[in-house]
Swiss-Prot record:
Function field: NDH-1 shuttles electrons from NADH, via FMN and iron-sulfur (Fe-S) centers, to quinones in the respiratory chain. The immediate electron acceptor for the enzyme in this species is believed to be a menaquinone. Couples the redox reaction to proton translocation (for every two electrons transferred, four hydrogen ions are translocated across the cytoplasmic membrane), and thus conserves the redox energy in a proton gradient.
Record carries keyword Membrane: yes
Gene Ontology MF: a single term: NAD binding
Subcellular compartments: Cell membrane
Similarity comment text for this entry: Belongs to the complex I 49 kDa subunit family.
The protein, known as: NADH-quinone oxidoreductase subunit D
Catalytic activities: a quinone + NADH + 5 H(+)(in) = a quinol + NAD(+) + 4 H(+)(out)
Membrane-topology descriptor: Peripheral membrane protein
Main subcellular location of this protein, as a coarse class: membrane
Subunit-level organization: NDH-1 is composed of 15 different subunits. Subunits NuoB, C, D, E, F, and G constitute the peripheral sector of the complex.
Entry keywords, A to Z: Cell membrane, Membrane, NAD, Quinone, Translocase, Transport
Keyword ATP-binding listed: no
PANTHER family named among the record's database cross-references: NADH DEHYDROGENASE [UBIQUINONE] IRON-SULFUR PROTEIN 2, MITOCHONDRIAL, NADH-UBIQUINONE OXIDOREDUCTASE 49 KDA SUBUNIT
Amino acid sequence: MTTEPLTPPTSGALLHTEIMSLNVGPQHPSTHGVLRLVVDMDGEYVTRVTPHMGYLHTGFEKTFEHRTYHQGVTYAPRTDYLHCFGHELAYVLSVEKLLGAEVPERATTVRVMLHELGRIHSHLVFVGTGLLDLGALTPFFYAFREKEAVQDLFEAVCGYRMNQGYFRVGGLARDIPEDWPARVAAFLDTFERGVDEYETLFAKNPIFLDRAKGVGVIPRDVAIDLGLTGPNLRASGVPLDHRKANPYCGYETYDFEVPVSQAGDSLARFQLRLLELRESAKIIRQALKRLTPGPIKDPNRKISLPPRSELETSMEAVIHHFKLVTEGFHPPKGEVYVPTESARGEVGYYIVSDGGSMPYRVKIRAPSFVNLQALEYACVGGQFADLITILASIDPVLGDVDR
C-alpha cells in the first residue's frame, strides 16, 4: 500500500475565496466619534475602505446665516472641539478682514498664546488616544495629565474648559488674569519634560515602531492631489504651514521651525506632532516676553461692545451697546477668506456679506473632512490591524468632518 503526502489545493478551480465586508463603527473606540467605515477584505488584507460620514452633522454652516456675526463666535469652536481656538480664530479673522478692524497688539499676542495652547491640547489627545488604539495604556495617562493642565489654563481665562468662545470680532471678550502668564510659564516647564517622557514611551517603543513604520504611506504627489494639509501633508514632504506661508496674528515675527518628514507613513505623522509640541511651546515663550499692558478690543464702538464702566457715564455707549446686542454690526458687501493653521491643517471661513447684520453665506474649510479622503489610499493592500494605526495617525475629528 502506498501513501501520498497531503497537499493543500492550489488550483484556482479548487480554492474559492470571496470578499468580506466588515463594518467598523459608527460606535467604535478607534474612530473617536461617530464614523462608520465599510471595509472590504480579502482574508486579512484590505481591498477597499468606504467612510460613511454625517452621523455628527450639526448644520453649523447654515446656522451661521441666521445669526449675527457676533453670535457666530459661539458656533465656531464647536466644530473642532479639540482645537477650539483654531476655528474660533479663523472665524474672527475673516470677519475682521471684512470689516477692516484693527486688533490691539495685546489681544493679538493673547490670541497666539491660546492658539498654540489649543494646538498642544489637541496633540496631547492625539498622543494619548493614538497609543491607546494600539493597546498601550500608559501613555494615555501621561498625555492627559498635561491635557488637564492646559484645560485649567483655558478655564482661568474664559471660564470654559472646552468650546470657549473667548475671541471677539476686534479683540477678546475680557482681559487675562494677572497671574495667568506666570501660570503658563510654569506649565511649560513641566510640559517640556513631559514631551521627553512621551518620546521614551512612544517614539522609542519597538512594538509601536513595528506597527507604524512603513504603514499607510501617502506619497508627496498623492497628498497634494488629495488636498491634505497640516501634519498629514508635512509628513509626506510638503513644508506648507500657513503660519509661515500666509502669516496672521504676527506669526512672521516669531522664531519657530516647521517639522517636515519625507517618509509619509504613520510613524512620520506621529513623530511630527511630537515635534510640533516643542515648537508650540517655543512660540508661547516668545509671546510671554512680548506681552505688554494695553487695550484688548478695537476702539471702534460700532464693532466692539463698550466697557461696562462707560455704560454708567455715557448715553452714547448705551446706544452702541443696545445696537450691537439687538441688531449687530453691518459689514460692507463682499466676500473674504483667511487661511489659518490649526492642529489638523488648514482652517478657513469663506464668508459672503450682503451688507446685512448676518452672513449671506458661510463655508467652512475644515481639514479633517479632506484628510479623511486619504484613508482608503493609505489602507488598501495592508492588513486590517493597520487600518486602526492609519486612522489614528490621520487624526480626524468628526465635528470637523460633518459640520
